[in-house]
UniProtKB/Swiss-Prot annotation:
Protein name: Small ribosomal subunit protein uS8
Lineage: Archaea, Thermoproteota, Thermoprotei, Desulfurococcales, Desulfurococcaceae
Coiled-coil ranges from the UniProt annotation: none
GO CC aspect terms: ribonucleoprotein complex; ribosome
Gene source species: Aeropyrum pernix (strain ATCC 700893 / DSM 11879 / JCM 9820 / NBRC 100138 / K1)
GO molecular function: rRNA binding; structural constituent of ribosome
């Protein structure tokens, strides 16, 4: 079986484990992008922590869940947004968040993976890859 979008599989694994009330989720295969997204989720308080497990193949992440995630997923198609668009928060981005100040959009920017709030502070745009609330 071919995995086309490992980030989408990781977000689905987290969402399914949260809905089932599990204390942890196993994400495989691992990647740098998934690690960066997990760091953001940990920093913002959505997950308790994560660890990398080297299994000799692709590696895995064990994610400790806190029960704070209501919805999580990837944004398809991955659309680029400029700083001006991000400041206005157009309708095609607003639909991924629960309300005005609830939730995060995760962007891939030239300065690394960050939340939409960090991108607004740094006045840069990027590609919207995921959302969480």
């Amino acid at each position: 079986m071919v995995m086309l979008d490992t980030l989408a599989n990781a977000m689905a694994a987290i969402k399914n484990a949260e809905m089932r009330g599990k204390g942890e989720a196993i994400i495989m295969p691992s990647s740098k992008l998934i690690a960066n997204v997990l760091r953001i989720l940990e920093k913002e308080g959505y997950i308790g922590g994560f660890e990398y497990i080297d299994d000799g193949r692709w590696g895995k992440f064990r994610v400790k869940l806190l029960g704070r995630i209501n919805d999580i997923g990837v944004v398809k198609p991955r659309t680029p947004v400029s700083y001006r668009e991000l400041a206005k928060m157009p309708e095609h981005l607003r639909k991924y968040l629960a309300s005005r100040d609830v939730g995060l959009l995760i962007l891939s920017t030239p300065q690394g993976v960050m939340t939409h709030r960090e991108a607004l502070k740094r006045k840069i745009g990027g590609i919207v890859i995921a959302y969480v609330y």
